[in-house]
Curated annotation (Swiss-Prot):
It catalyses: Endonucleolytic cleavage of RNA, removing 5'-extranucleotides from tRNA precursor. One of its GO terms (biological process) is tRNA 5'-leader removal. Part of ribonuclease P, a protein complex that generates mature tRNA molecules by cleaving their 5'-ends. It is found in: Cytoplasm. Keywords: Cytoplasm, Endonuclease, Hydrolase, Nuclease, tRNA processing. It is an enzyme of class 3 (hydrolase). HAMAP family: RNase_P_2. The lineage of its organism: Archaea, Thermoproteota, Thermoprotei, Sulfolobales, Sulfolobaceae. Belongs to the eukaryotic/archaeal RNase P protein component 2 family. InterPro entries: Pop5/Rpp14/Rnp2-like, Rnp2-like_sf. It comes from the Archaea. This is Ribonuclease P protein component 2. One of its GO terms (molecular function) is ribonuclease P activity. It comes from Saccharolobus islandicus (strain L.S.2.15 / Lassen #1) (Sulfolobus islandicus). The gene is rnp2. Consists of a catalytic RNA component and at least 4-5 protein subunits.
Amino acid sequence: MNSIQLIIDIILILWLLILTVLYLRKKSLNLNIVKNKKIVRAKRYIVFYVIAESKVKSDDLERVVRNSLKDLLGNVWLNIANPKVVTYREDTQEGIISTNRIGYKAVLASLPFAKEINGNKILIVPRRTTGSLKKAKKLIGLK
């Protein structure tokens, strides 16, 4: 009886050892795969203008955009989209929000929820989404 149990134990140990080796080989092969950097870096630029009672500063605008995205979809989507106000012209109240390809729709959906800055009512109106910063700057009248 003990010899049968010993044989079964040895077979199970060998089986687990083989599975462990196969798993570690597969894991090491996956570590060498490089992600497609073009997909990771794909950015979208949202050209927008602001309708407000008074002038709005760029820092306040970025804070409100991030808070509206956080309120609408939570911290997970805030970290995924990572919206940043790249350029903002205070004279014409036009600007560009930079985000990635995955999260630009979430940023667009959250813009109407940005309703006030420092007690002043605002409305952020997206004009166009582009894939290049050069074209976005051209749309707001910069070089």
